[in-house]
Design a protein with these regions (language model features):
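Glycosyltransferase catalytic domains, chiefly GT-A lineage
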Residues: 3-351
Length: 351
């Protein structure tokens, strides 16, 4: 955390030995999310220390073929609760709307002090102490990189988008706090939405979902990337709109390991990491690179992970056909939205 502007607070010590009052929320549906979610939760149960026995709720918030019997068996074995919800959402086609629906659905059903959203492409390498909300802090997240649509300021090509986005909460872009990314950039208030923790009493999940829909209603985005990654922009703007006290997580609590950040495949960089955001590193082409990176600092993770091999989609022709049908329908709805907004995936006017 660098520029600690309005709403930011300083880091404090955590209480050792006590399980946090926290619920973990994930999404699960037929396909790749099945093995990814199971592997993520197993890493939590094995290596999560005080966090290992937290309640995990896997939400299915949109239409999907049935989960496999093996997935249901492993969910029961790992103590994962499954929640099906059927929201009436016109933006079900959005790649990440399911995450917002999931967090809002769980928020109204649990009583823990904190709720943590965890993407399924994450591994817990050791006890993730940084994820516990300190007193007086309402929201935790990290900014490992500027991503595709982050803005470094007025000269950044993405900045007009940030001006339009800030306007929806009655601000201008220069009102937003600055963050220092893990790869050394100073950017506007743009969090990674793969892992965040918030105080349940703030009702952040409900407000985040409402803001997400509003941003799509108002057609703030003018490119495919702006639509695709909009949840990460809305995440921070909802924090600002609600006036929440926030704190940036260190990179070690959400460290990215992926093909587009090749320099992170470095055992020395990963040694101190407690939460690994591996993105595409479980694919066959990067599998050995992932294992080699884990050896120096996390031999126990390497030993557990190596026999499992790369992640693959459960084999089922009917499920594959059904998923493809849903993908085509959602793709058509997405293209219709782009057309109404005046652009297509491959081309857009000035941002």
């Amino acid at each position: 955390l660098t520029d600690c502007l309005t709403g930011a607070v300083q880091k404090g010590d955590n209480t050792a030995g006590k399980q946090p009052s926290m619920t973990i929320v994930v999404c699960i549906e037929s396909g790749m999310l099945e093995p990814l979610t199971l592997r993520m939760v197993e890493s939590l149960r094995r290596f999560g220390g005080r966090f290992a026995n937290l309640e995990v709720i896997a939400v299915t918030p949109r239409s999907t073929p049935a989960l496999t019997r093996e997935t249901h068996r492993r969910m029961e074995e790992l103590g994962i609760k499954h929640l099906r919800v059927f929201p009436d959402n016109p933006y079900v086609w959005h790649h990440y709307m399911n995450k917002a629906e999931a967090i809002a659905a769980v928020e109204s059903r649990v009583t823990t002090e904190a709720i943590a959203w965890i993407d399924s492409d994450i591994l817990f390498l050791r006890e993730p102490n940084g994820l516990e909300l300190p007193p007086g802090v309402d929201f935790l997240a990290s900014a490992p990189d500027a991503g595709v649509i982050g803005s470094r300021g007025v000269t950044d090509p993405n900045d007009p988008f940030w001006e339009r986005s800030a306007a929806l909460i009655g601000r201008v872009a220069d009102d937003l706090p600055w963050l220092q990314t893990g790869d050394g950039h100073r950017i506007r208030f743009y969090w990674n939405a793969g892992l965040y923790v918030y105080r349940r009493s703030t009702r952040f999940g409900r407000e985040f979902l409402a803001d997400f829909k509003t941003f799509l209603d108002r057609q703030v985005a003018r490119t495919h990337s702006q639509v695709h990654f909009m949840d990460q922009v809305v995440l921070g703007l909802t924090v600002i709109r609600l006036g929440l006290a926030w704190q940036a997580l260190p990179d070690s609590s959400n460290f990215p390991l992926c093909s587009y950040l090749p320099r992170n495949y470095d055992g020395a960089k990963v040694t101190g990491v407690s939460v690994l955001h591996f993105h595409d590193s479980m694919e066959p082409k990067l599998w050995n690179k992932l294992l080699e990176t884990l050896v120096p600092g996390h031999p126990q993770i390497h030993e557990w992970l190596e026999p499992q091999g790369p992640v693959s989609v459960p084999s089922s022709i009917p499920s594959s056909l059904a998923r493809e049908g849903l993908r085509m329908v959602r793709g058509a709805r997405r293209r219709a939205y782009y057309a109404r907004s005046g652009f297509i995936k491959a081309w857009s006017p000035a941002r």
